[in-house]
A protein has these predicted regions:
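Hydrophobic scaffolds flanking metal-cofactor catalytic centers in soluble metalloenzymes
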Residues: 1-173
Length: 173
C-alpha cells in the first residue's frame, strides 16, 4: 500500500509544529485546552476562549506528533501550501521533499547561528530566537567574527522566511 501524502511529507517536515511557521496554535475552546493540559501540554491564556498552545509544540517527537489522535482541531485541519500543491499535482512528491529538506537546512542554520550568538533558549519560536540572537549580537559589541555571524544569520533567516512564504503558508495566513 502506498503511503499517504501526509505520511510522505508531514513526517519529514514538522515545520508547522516546531515554531518555524507559527508562534502558537489557537485552541478551539476550553474543553480542547483542558484535554491537552491533561496530556501534559502547557496552555497559555490569551483573549480567546481556549487559549493557545505555544510553539514549538511540547508534543512534537522528532518530526511527528506524539498526540496525533488527540491533536487540536487547528492542527487537524491545517494543510500547508506544499501539501495542497502535492495533492493537486502541481508539485511532485520528490519536489516537495526537496523543498522541505532545503527549508529545514536553513532553519537548522538559523538555530545554530542563533546559539553561536548566545541565544540558547530552544523552546521559543524561530522568529523569537532570531530576534533575541540579533539583540544579543548587538549588546555584545561588534567584533569582525560576530558581525559576520550576524550577517549570515540575517541571510539564513531571509531564506527561511522566503521559503515559508512561498512554499508553506497559504495566501490567507
Amino acid at each position: 500500500m502506498k503511503p499517504s501524502l501526509t505520511e510522505q511529507l508531514c513526517t519529514r517536515c514538522g515545520l508547522c509544529c516546531d515554531g518555524s511557521l507559527f508562534a502558537d496554535v489557537e485552541l478551539a475552546g476550553s474543553a480542547e485546552a483542558a484535554g491537552l493540559e491533561v496530556m501534559g501540554l502547557e496552555i497559555e491564556e490569551d483573549d480567546t476562549e481556549g487559549g493557545v498552545l505555544e510553539q514549538p509544540c511540547g508534543a512534537l517527537r522528532g518530526k511527528r506528533c506524539g498526540i496525533y489522535a488527540h491533536r487540536p482541531e487547528c492542527c487537524r485541519t491545517f494543510e500547508c501550501r506544499l501539501l495542497q500543491d502535492a495533492r493537486r499535482g502541481t508539485v511532485s512528491v520528490e519536489q516537495a521533499v526537496e523543498h522541505i529538506a532545503e527549508t529545514l537546512k536553513h532553519v537548522g542554520r538559523v538555530r545554530k547561528l542563533a546559539e553561536e550568538l548566545g541565544q540558547r533558549e530552544v523552546n521559543l519560536p524561530l522568529k523569537e530566537r532570531y530576534a533575541d540572537a540579533l539583540a544579543l549580537a548587538d549588546e555584545a559589541g561588534v567584533s569582525r567574527s560576530r558581525a559576520r555571524k550576524r550577517a549570515e544569520l540575517e541571510t539564513e533567516m531571509s531564506a527561511v522566511e522566503r521559503s515559508i512564504t512561498e512554499k508553506f503558508l497559504r495566501d490567507s495566513e
